Amino acid sequence: LLAGADGAGKGETVKRVLEWLDARGLDTHAFGAPTDEERERPRWWRYWMRLPRRGRIGIFFGSWYSEPLVERAFGRLSRARYDRMLSEIAFFEQMLAEDGALVVKLWVHLSKKGLRKRMRRLEDDPATRWRITKADWKHFRKYDRYIEASEHAIRRTDTSHAPWLLVEATDERYRDLMAGRTLLERFRSRLAAAAPAR
């Protein structure tokens, strides 16, 4: 699961990780605003439907964290409701872990100054201009509130069965290598624990 501010490089990180992994064992899902069908169902339905089968890897870009974080940053969600949603998230991740899933959560972080610089660089390049939208700038204006909401979410949902790893995104190469290294270490650790004793 990758999360972080819009424009911090989550999509690029996913792209790099996909280059390093065997695509035959991957299920990659990007979540935007809920569709009409998803709005007619319980909140968790859209995520349950996309969980990978046992033995496969699911990559979630935009996830169950996105909606509560954005809603809280824009002041459309009370602190009490936000805390209830975070409790639901922690319960969901605990349930996945107890069922044998390896939950890896990466928070891609970029400072406000670094994010502004990155967004301007992307916007100034005709080849990447399309990647920065009015919505990205709208979200950027709420950066401080988004970070405040994010820090609270990370504290509330950082658990032994689903810990967060903060990935500094100032250096794009470091960001990608850190994400890949974390996945490799977590996969190796899980496989070693599952290996039969000799």
Name each model feature, range by range.
Residues 1-198:
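Glycine-rich phosphate-binding loop of ATP-dependent small-molecule kinases
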